[in-house]
């Protein structure tokens, strides 16, 4: 256990695993769009998108629990303790974050949505330092957050304009989703020290996925044309969620929130670059703006973690 702790707290290992998570999440964006097209889910059909997300997360949770059971060579059934911790995490992360996010995205521009989403990592670090107070806010952490968020702004404003309008169901709901993300990050950081982060992740995904599916169906959502390719896409997205969020939870179990959350600023960069490559929009990803954004984010990550790097 000590060796595991030492390994998972090394800055290089944290950086590698966190970036793997961000690459997986980034690859999900173009795949989700492909899934919408194949299953005839309209861009403005929020209810059907929530059904799609619900099925994805339910399957992701089941996959995590199945793989964990195979690894432990016994069937892992969540007990009362796991359920006690999984319910608040699921309400904050899978249900709260994604319910408000999907509705918000449908009522605002992609530019503003991307920028506000970038605030989630900033909010998580602020909550850890100022509200929960399980770590100390320093000028280094603040500077790293500002630089990381600046990188998100740059990557989202490339060749685009930004209006300053604000609506509750648009920008407001996306902001609420990021507050929910911040809360879930803190909860995972605390609860993963008490129970298995893998079982916690699988349980909360399964519960949250079922709730999202029922909410989407209740709103009139449905998946139209279900094909073999569509099923493969849902399985892939479920694997992305299962692997990425479980890795993220394990990292949060062994490290300060700020040390892990700062890598979340890499996520928008991965989304833009991978979407551009897969969708054939190479010029959009590889230009001066994306390089500046990458430099800002990497500098922010270094500033937050450089002390830890010296210790390790």
What are these regions (language model features)?
Residues 69-113, 117, 154, 237-255:
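Specific transmembrane alpha-helical segments of multi-pass solute transporters/efflux pumps
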Residues 2-8, 57, 156-158, 230, ...:
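C-terminal-most transmembrane helix of multi-pass membrane proteins
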Residues 24-44, 59, 98-108, 116, ...:
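Juxtamembrane C-cap of transmembrane helices in multi-pass membrane transport proteins
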Residues 51-54, 58, 62, 93, ...:
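Specific alpha-helical transmembrane segments that line the substrate/conduction pathway
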């Amino acid at each position: 256990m000590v060796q595991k702790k030492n390994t998972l707290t090394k800055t290089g290992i944290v950086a590698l695993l966190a970036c793997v998570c961000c690459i997986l999440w980034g690859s999900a964006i173009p795949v989700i769009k492909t899934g919408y097209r194949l299953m005839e889910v309209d861009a403005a059909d929020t209810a059907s998108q929530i059904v799609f997300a619900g099925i994805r997360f339910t399957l992701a949770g089941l996959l995590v629990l199945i793989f964990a059971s195979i690894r432990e060579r016994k069937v892992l059934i969540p007990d009362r303790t796991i359920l006690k911790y999984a319910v608040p995490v699921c309400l904050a992360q899978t249900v709260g974050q994604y319910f408000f996010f999907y509705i918000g995205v449908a009522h605002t521009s992609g530019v503003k949505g991307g920028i506000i989403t970038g605030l989630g990592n900033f909010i998580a670090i602020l909550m850890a330092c100022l509200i929960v107070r399980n770590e100390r806010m320093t000028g280094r952490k603040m500077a790293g957050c500002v630089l990381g968020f600046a990188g998100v702004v740059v990557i989202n404003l490339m060749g685009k304009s930004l209006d300053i309008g604000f609506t509750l169901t648009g920008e407001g709901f996306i902001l609420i989703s990021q507050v929910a993300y911040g809360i879930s990050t803190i909860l995972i950081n605390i609860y993963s020290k008490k129970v298995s982060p893998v079982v916690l992740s699988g349980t909360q995904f399964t519960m949250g996925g079922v709730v999202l599916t029922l909410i989407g169906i209740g709103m009139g959502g449905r998946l139209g044309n279900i094909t073999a390719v569509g099923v493969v896409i849902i399985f892939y997205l479920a694997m992305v969620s299962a692997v990425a969020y479980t890795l993220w939870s394990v990292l949060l179990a062994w490290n300060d929130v700020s040390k892990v959350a700062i890598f979340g600023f890499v996520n928008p960069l991965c989304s833009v670059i991978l979407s551009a490559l897969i969708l054939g929009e190479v010029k959009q990803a590889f230009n001066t703006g994306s390089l500046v954004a990458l430099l800002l984010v990497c500098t922010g990550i270094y500033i937050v973690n450089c002390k830890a790097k010296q210790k390790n």
